[in-house]
Amino acid sequence: MRSLGALLLLLSACLAVSAGPVPTPPDNIQVQENFNISRIYGKWYNLAIGSTCPWLKKIMDRMTVSTLVLGEGATEAEISMTSTRWRKGVCEETSGAYEKTDTDGKFLYHKSKWNITMESYVVHTNYDEYAIFLTKKFSRHHGPTITAKLYGRAPQLRETLLQDFRVVAQGVGIPEDSIFTMADRGECVPGEQEPEPILIPRVRRAVLPQEEEGSGGGQLVTEVTKKEDSCQLGYSAGPCMGMTSRYFYNGTSMACETFQYGGCMGNGNNFVTEKECLQTCRTVAACNLPIVRGPCRAFIQLWAFDAVKGKCVLFPYGGCQGNGNKFYSEKECREYCGVPGDGDEELLRFSN
């Protein structure tokens, strides 16, 4: 996990990038009251980060959950640090030491390569669940910058803690669009190579031209599109910390479900409307699903395929949940489920 140490390495990289002025960090940072250094020792997961360092935005798509282990140092004046994280497809381990100060909860780290000393503060922690660190540094290119990091004893934290972290970060001048959550790719062993992702082929029907308002709502499908490839992925909130309601295709339930999108990055399994999601990702297997109105109380007339009757029928959709057996016109239902005897041409099947 990107540790205090990895954080400091990240901050030092700001020296190599030129950008505009950044907000000035506060002069006086308050540490956790009655800080107990022995209780901060042990393993932590770095789950979120925010920074005024301009370079940070350039690598946000590559930042993943990392681990940090803190412990007693080689001398009474130090604490030891070991961080483990994925970097460029390889599991990397970094070790170092932090210097204690006269203020409990404040530590110094010297980066000899850049000849700078960084100040790190433990500003909030309950020791058993979470910890928030702030780190200040000064570079000749950007002047003073500040970085906030959220750590957890487990790979997941309560949503309220993520919200509290965002408030703390913004309170020291970090812009909202510079606060990110980390993608969790799991823990790794130093030297381990990250496996290549495996895409599972799926089968769906070709669609009618746009003017026919077919299942795809677009041109005749003759090749696999990047968006359709993404239908096999799980949803991704992305590293930013916004809360925008979006839809993703759940291949297990064969339905489009809602999730909270952070506002940046993520992946292609991300749709503004349920209709767009279904018309992009639904497969012919949806025609065999039961007709489900859903628990909400709206009254929306949609079409579904009745497998018993062998035809498309109207049904009142409640407005939420349901499943993929849900079409926005009779023509869409018929062309998708291949209703015989309608004079329609047989629809082609293909796999990606």
Curated annotation (Swiss-Prot):
Protein's UniProt name: Protein AMBP
Positions of 3-hydroxy-L-kynurenine binding: 53, 111, 137, 149
Gene: AMBP
Outcome after substituting residue 111 to T: Impairs the reductase activity toward cytochrome c in the presence of NADPH. Impairs the reductase activity toward oxidized collagen
Family note: In the N-terminal section; belongs to the calycin superfamily. Lipocalin family.
Leader sequence segment: 1-19
Site, Inhibitory (P1) (chymotrypsin, elastase): residue positions: 241-242
Gene Ontology molecular function, alphabetical: calcium channel inhibitor activity; calcium oxalate binding; carbohydrate binding; heme binding; IgA binding; oxidoreductase activity; protein homodimerization activity; serine-type endopeptidase inhibitor activity
EC number: 1.6.2.-
Species of the source: Homo sapiens (Human)
Additional record remark: In vitro, the first twelve residues of the amino end of the inhibitor appear to have a reactive site capable of inhibiting the activity of a number of enzymes. Its in vivo function is not known.
Keywords noted in UniProt: Cell membrane, Chromophore, Cleavage on pair of basic residues, Cytoplasm, Disulfide bond, Endoplasmic reticulum, Extracellular matrix, Glycoprotein, Host-virus interaction, Membrane, Mitochondrion, Mitochondrion inner membrane, Nucleus, Oxidoreductase, Protease inhibitor, Proteoglycan, Repeat, Secreted, Serine protease inhibitor, Signal
Effect caused by changing residue 149 to T: Impairs the reductase activity toward cytochrome c in the presence of NADPH. Impairs the reductase activity toward oxidized collagen
Cleavage (site feature) positions: 199
UniProt enzyme class: oxidoreductase
Disulphide connectivity of cysteines: 91-188, 231-281, 240-264, 256-277, 287-337, 296-320, 312-333
Post-translational modification: The precursor is proteolytically processed into separately functioning proteins. N-glycosylated. N-glycan heterogeneity at Asn-115: Hex5HexNAc4 (major), Hex6HexNAc5 (minor) and dHex1Hex6HexNAc5 (minor). N-glycan at Asn-250: Hex5HexNAc4.
Glycan-bearing residues: 24, 36, 115, 215, 250
